[in-house]
């Protein structure tokens, strides 16, 4: 049985960095880290500097990006991250 997933879009000021189905997202919230899974309650949260990690629904791979701050919006089966990306 497939794990519940949601659409994730990660956008920086320069370009779209990721768009796809994921089963989880963890983010460095400004008041502490938080996680999002399918059917999460709607919310908007500020994120600080740290690692944004997500697990792809199809491959099961966990990927991450270093972010310098931004905003996460969760609405009806979709999550949008607007973030400044920190160079490696």
How should these model regions be labeled?
Residues 1-5:
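Short, charged, intrinsically disordered terminal tails
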Residues 6-88:
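Compact, glycine-rich, soluble single-domain proteins
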């Amino acid at each position: 049985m497939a794990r519940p997933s949601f659409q994730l879009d990660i956008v920086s000021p320069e370009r779209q960095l990721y768009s796809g189905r994921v089963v989880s997202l963890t983010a460095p919230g400004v008041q502490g880290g938080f996680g999002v899974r399918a059917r999460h309650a709607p919310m908007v949260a500020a994120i600080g500097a740290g690692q944004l990690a997500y697990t792809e629904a199809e491959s099961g791979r966990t990927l991450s990006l270093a972010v310098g701050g931004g905003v996460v919006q969760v609405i009806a089966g979709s999550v949008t991250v607007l973030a400044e990306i920190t160079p490696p």
